[in-house]
Amino acid sequence: MVSGTDTTEVGATTKAPPSEGTEGILDDHSSNSQPQAEKPAKTHYPLSFWLAFLGLCCTGLVSALDGSIVATALPSIIESLDGGDDYPLYGQLADLWGRRYVMIGATIIFILGSGLCGGSSSMNMLIWSRAVQGIGAGGINMLIDMIICDLVPMRERGNFIGLLFLFVSLGATIGPFVGGILTDRASWRWLWLLILLQIFYINLPFGGVALLLLILFLHVKWKNDLSTMERLRRVDVIGNSILIGATFAILYALTYGGTRYTWSDPHIAAPLTIGLVGLVAAFFWEMSPWCKYPVMPPLHFQNRTSAAAFFISFMCMLLAFWINFFYPVYFQAVLIASPTRAGVYTLPRAIAFPLFAAVGGAIVSKTGRYRTVHLVSTGIMPLVMGLSSILDQGSSKAEWVIWQLLFGVSGGMMISTTLQAVQAALPESEVATSVGTWSFVRSLGTIWGLSIPAAIFNNRFDQLSTQFDPSIRALFTRGQAYEHGTAKFIQSFDPETRQIVIQAYIEALKRVWQIGIVFGGVTFLSVFFEKEIHLRTELKTDFGLDEKKKGEVAKEENDVENNGTTVQ
């Protein structure tokens, strides 16, 4: 085992009995308990661990780079297709078939999607090929966190999640520059060249290296005591089907609402209603006695600290996308910056985010306390929103640089510490489903994090556009103000009209930030529902890294017969 401690068996991921993982038991390790101040023992990680971790980091880098490059050039549809793929189904499959095979499978799907993109002969084929990539990328993003949880004690997970985000943020930072340069020359020819260059020089080589590292070094234990038919019976088909259907219905409505159709149009109202009802139905199904193997066990939400941490995770992703999507509008529509220069202007938060993800993880690992980190980081968020609301044409560069740095501090510290709060109150047997649920609620946060501020922005802009000439106003109807928020479009107007349009953008953005203050404040207040629970320093899992030598294979085979645990 990685931690050097003995592995103890834990139950399958089913509904836990009331005595397991409940708040009453875990209150013994609350914020006033002495174990929180204990210094964790030094953990030794073998070379095989670091090589496997390198494979995970390379996979995360490719996934982040892929999404950020093409999304810059094809933002609305492509970003939407990638927004709802982190389904808890991956967590359940990883429990039943093991982390190694599911992770390798997700990576292969991602690489396959890349190949399909390269062979696409039309925009529609490209979009659906990107959807295949999204399915693989969703599994990659979730399974990386899950495997880290399997290989690293809870107290130390923040360090590794922060280190992982250095790789992920590198991809997310480089991508917009490449995509922005191509967007400046936007045409189908340039976009097609972008796709081909990305696939043949980034996705396939780096993805191939990552896949090879995973195949060679990601050898983890796996509880293999069930037949294939029994595993299939334990997949929550009903719950997963409802969740996937509801998510795509919401995704469709939020993608086209206010743009292609009005919000009251049946094309939008119907799927949005169906999606929201579906989420409620999925929740009740998971809580019902008929669901024997829930994909999102009720235990996750019955515990106060875990439930609060899930909500905070959702809100933090919502606010992150709130800022990530509307600062570029300010740069391009108000400061008249090109897409490439707007990408440069986002560097402060792009640099601060991964650095403070590492800092936040290190603080939690050192102190064993996550609640203080959450109070500080969520307290910064409404401040950032408030400061952003005063930005206009005359704002100095120092202002928007500092505001973005503050967001990087806030978002970075949260991204690497919320999972520990989710899992602190849960037994180790819930690692897979808790990571799956955590990924799902964060994925929902990304969807609403674009849709809510976009609706606010478009509604406010429509109100302000009454002062425009009717011919000009027609250009901004049905959500086109967001789509037309580019320097090239704004500069196409005569100076007088241009200033009126820019002022409308300033006022619409101000409303977006003002309402963002409320969302940030709610996130801050929700931290008070968390309890400071002792973070375990020992690792007890059925899925830890295998360090056995080849000469011990026979002994391992006997272990399979005795307790059903094998090595992948």
From Swiss-Prot:
| PANTHER family per the UniProt record, alphabetical | MAJOR FACILITATOR SUPERFAMILY, MAJOR FACILITATOR SUPERFAMILY (MFS) PROFILE DOMAIN-CONTAINING PROTEIN
List the subcellular locations: Cell membrane
Which family does the similarity line name? Belongs to the major facilitator superfamily.
Q: Where is this region: Disordered?
A: 1-39
Give the glycosylated residues: 303, 563
Segments of skewed composition (Polar residues): 1-11
**What is the name of this protein?**
MFS-type efflux transporter phmH
Q: Which InterPro entries match?
A: MFS (IPR011701), MFS_dom (IPR020846), MFS_trans_sf (IPR036259)
What superkingdom heads the lineage? Eukaryota
Q: Which UniProt keywords apply?
A: Cell membrane, Glycoprotein, Membrane, Transmembrane, Transmembrane helix, Transport, Virulence
